[in-house]
Amino acid sequence: MRESFASLLATGAGKLALSLLFAATPFTSAYTFNQVPSPNLDISNLGRIAFAGDFDSISLYEYEGQTQETPSRNGTLLSRYPNGVFASINTTDADIKAMCNLRINDTERIVFAGNFTGVGNMPTPGGIALLNTTDGRVRALDGLDGTVNTLYCDKSGGQVYVGGLFNGLNSSNAIIWKDGWQELDFNGFNGAVHSIAQAAGGNIIFGGEFTGIGRGNASVASENATQIIPISSANISAQTNSGLPGFTDPKVIACKSDYSSGGAGQTWLLANNAPGFWKADFGFGFEPTRLKMYNTDFEGRGTKTFRFTALPDGGIMNMSYVDPSNGRTAYCDARCPLPQGNKTAQDFTFVNVVGMNSFRVDISEWYGSGAGLNGIQLFQDAMFSYAVNDFNEAQNCGASGTLSKASSTGNWQVSPSHNSNSQYLTTVLQGDPIRPDAASVTFSPDIKQSGNYSVTIYTPGCQGDGTCGSRGRVNVTATIGQGQSEEAILWQTNNFDKYDEVYNGYIDAAGGFQPSVILRPASGQGPGPLTVVAQRVRFTLLKATSGNINGLFEYKPGEKLDENNLADSVINAAGASLDPRGKALITSVSSSGQNLYVAGNFSNNDGRNNIFSFKQGASDPTALPNRGLNRQVMTLYQNDSMLYVGGNFTNTGEGNVQGLNGVAALVNDKWQPLGAGVNGVVLYLVPFSLNVTANQPEQVLAVSGFFDSVNEFNGNPSTNVQDFAVWVPSRSNWLHNLDFFTLAMSGRLMTFADVPGGERWFGGSVSSGSLLASGTAELNNGDDALSLEAFPVNLQAQQSGEAGVPSRKRAILEGQDMSTTGVRTGKFHTEGNNNMTILAGHFSTTGTDQQNITNLVIVDGGDSDKITGFSDELDANSTFTALAVTSNNILFAGGMVTGRLDNSRVAGLVTYDLTAKRFTPVQPPPLQGPNITVNAIAPRPNSNDVFVAGQFLTAGSLGCAAVCIWNTERNQWNSPGNSLSGVVSSLTWISDTQMYISGNLTSGDNVTTILSFNPSNNQFTAIPGAINLPGPVNALTIANEDGSQFWAAGQGSDGTAYLQRYNGEQQWMPVDSALFGPGTDIRGIQVIQVSENHESSDLISDNEDLLLMGQIQIPNFGTVSAALFNGTNLVPFLLATKGADGQTTDGSLSSIFVEFPAFFSQQNGKHLALWAIVLIGLAIALVLTFLLVVAGILLEWYRNKAKGYSPAPQSYPDRMGNVGRLPPEQLFGTLSVPRSRPTNYLFTCTALCIGMDVPTIHRRCNPVAHHKQLPAWTEQVRTEQTTETRPAINEDGCGTSIGGLLFRLPFSRARRISGDDVFDTILACSS
């Protein structure tokens, strides 16, 4: 049965962590992977460096052939790179179900098979091929028609036993390949074969769904098993005609209610005394088995000899017939006779069954004046129903009773046959989701008798009509009795023609019941377009059973088979005793040592429920402990003394072993759970190697099937997975529960084969990366080699409005709603002895204290990586896109943010106290406008101003579009000017007096993409030539030390990506656009130093590379998430993927964040360690301090000497004489008490006043109306109100207002005031 794994898994690729220590023990492989040159990046001057984006796994580009492109959603031939990542060697258009290795001509080969119709672009009819493990080349093993389920490589005999659902030579469902196809003695089985194994004694054991041996799906030789081929639907032509009215139309003999009748309008006559031909061209292919010719006797005319030519091959068919003169069987080919004057048909039987879509009857001899015919009928021993109803049996063409037919709903069009067998119907559907009832085709065959039938549906390949990109899944429902139906989900993504068996069993045709097959779109698909095709359905009447066989058969090679003694085999007898009788399903047979295990869906009163065993030499089968398992077993894997079992079971037959959910192990005749199993069905068990312990490779078990979680057990919580998990036997635990540096893998493994002395090969569909990391990863440079490391937090994707609900990720691309999932930005916060990593975007996770965290998470490396973050305070569908931390440890987080804090609305921006671990009491008033988004936050150096930019119109009630300033000291919004509007994508400070603003901007009347802003005078200056860039700037980074040069990237109006460098001299230098393929989206750029210089370029220094992030399409390579530009070429750097809706798709990077963003200020020369820099700075400070003290002492000594000062006497005759004048307690008692500060001393020297405005001095000096107590050296200037903000420094002195009066201290007076006054004033003003 052609059953795609994907048809069982409506959801698909899952994701799981796999241990990454492969590099310590490289694989030995005959298949060579070439390592690519190192990028030689020197990231030491950036400190810690990490990436943010929308991905589930990420890898460094290390080996040729390594790509970000996801494997076929159907099947892939897999090996592994030396770093352990799975490598796609070739792809198939459906599943690889079986593999084994065979040595052919002293070279190891892998035979692999399944339900595929092609490998790459090569057709593989029958679904089987041969792989050369040295060079990866594939050779199709032609000769089968159908699908293969299982293989067994007999290495001693140099041959392969093949089982499945197919025809080959004169066999069905089982055959041998040994340098070509060879039939088994018994010609196969009458049903599908699912498993083949060799028992300890050397006999071959077949398991499957069969009840007899022989060519089982050959049609039964019965009149009731034949079908008339509708010749009347063909395009009919002829050479020569008699010219007699009513006798010239060759079509009249193709469809008649009575073919023996003749005359005008019912007979076709050739020209007198001349040969000719009659030809029929069909829109479909067929394999005729019988021909009926009705000769004419009009006016003594008639056809004497003819030949039947099959087209397009042109072969003359060999036929047999009964000679009416003697009743004996005779044969003919080029000169087949028709009797003269015959009133009935002459029957001919084709000796060979040959496919054709056209034929020609060549008439060479005639009776009387010329040849002619009354009728012609063609039959086949197969019952088809075609979607194109013209190809079905026609009314009034000789057939009686129920006829085959088809009906349809929806908008279907007839498509040419292309490379297929026949024309077919096609419909293209739109919608999200696409409704299953949008279109359907119902096939109704001509079933004349009850019996066992094989029902197969044919699907034309997608390469012929070019629809491979839009094909999907269909639901096929076979109604095989009153109220009885069978459903199957089938993929139509096959490259070449295929057929799938949708039912095998009894059909009751009594009472006029007509079975049907309905094809419609499967549910859960969309958006469109979805292309659905419908071609034909076949009903094949099967032979009766042969022998006492029930899904299990033992074959003894080299011995002649005696069908009368089949029951002498213990294995055959054991199968025959299983229930249901004649319907037992054997899915897997496995041999190890002296034991043979048989598993499937069956039962028996002796305890053989769904699994049992044979011991070599035993006379009876052995039931396994606890009466087997309670439901179907799908797969077995034997590893030494341990048998692993996967299936749909939940317990033993006795129900007394808990935790056997879908997967279990049999050890020393005892059932053991794998944890507590999974919550679904396990279909495949595949071992592979991992270094779970450093440098100690061990076997782990990949578990694939249909499940979405691993069950809780022994304190290990239930974990969401997607159809894939890995069991680690040495730890008796699932890999995701173990704390390892991990590799990412999504998809499934279905089968494997080992090459002696080489690597293990796999079949499945796998996307893997060197690191499992959801949305963010850190880049390290240890031991002179780059590596990736995940942050110690497990981020889960969430969709809008579904906070905390894990779901598959969606791409975050320019122009899309940012409420989609992913990590958009991050921040390393290391100032003030902090060691925090802040990640922000749209996701959910769980904190250290088990609290729910959404969209912003904080990992505190200074507190054992404690995980905290934003909980439910803000709307869960918010998305953060920008972060910044100020010097007082306040986090600014912006994006598309909404919610309420302390019952106050916030929008676009929130502030969070990282010290107190709570939102600040005072939040910035909400930003306002349509689609409010903050894209950039940039605190001004050496200032209390935080610049916030993005898409908004006002901040609170203040009008400041696109860019606004939040002052952290006054807690208020300020506008940089009223002339700016548009959307800002980035802010970049060059110094505390210059900033670059990029995006899609308008300043005054100037439309541009990049502005320079000077906060000292609030002036915007357009960068020369920026208005001529192809489109808005999405990313900008500095290109030189003084910031006069920079890189800018974005997308033009036509969607084409651009990258240009501004050289600081009003000149733009574009990068060749041919380097970027269609669909490139550059979202971030960063200059990085290299340790080895590359070729010089006008665009970039030879010791630098430019890192591009986003989704980068490199021509002739594919998509990457990050690439390096060296001035000439793009080199792949990072490859990222993500899981989505059952598939794995390209991931993307949105930004880079580093510990030390000031790249150019640190890049020159060799870089010292931080501790060395601190010590050097301290030493310099001490030296300077010492020199200043010495200079001060010398200066004072010189001044005193110049004025004639001399040292005072140093004698102290009475040291205690003045103690009584001022007791010590009065002198020292006030030292611990704060010094009383007179509030009237409000002025200080010019240095204290410069830069102060009135509110600042008011706040610092606590002014009160005590001006009458002011020192005599102050001047009262005038009285005025002081509510306005005005400078406190003017050209001749400092001034402030106290009690409504403005006072001024002239500089001259300031220089003459006493030291005490100055001292008191400093204390007052600095408070």
Curated annotation (Swiss-Prot):
Cellular localization per UniProt: Cell membrane
Q: Its membrane topology, per UniProt?
A: Single-pass type I membrane protein
Glycan attachment points = 74, 90, 105, 115, 132, 170, 217, 224, 235, 318, 342, 452, 475, 601, 639, 648, 691, 835, 852, 877, 931, 1000, 1006, 1126
* Spans traversing the lipid bilayer: 1170-1190
Signal peptide: which range, if any? 1-30
Among InterPro entries, the record links this protein to:
Gal_Oxase/kelch_b-propeller (IPR011043), Kelch-typ_b-propeller (IPR015915), Rax2-like_C (IPR024982), Rax2-like_second (IPR048266), Rax2-like_third (IPR048265)
Q: Which GO terms describe its biological process?
A: cell division
* UniProt-recorded name of the protein: Polarized growth protein L1
Gene name, Swiss-Prot/TrEMBL: L1
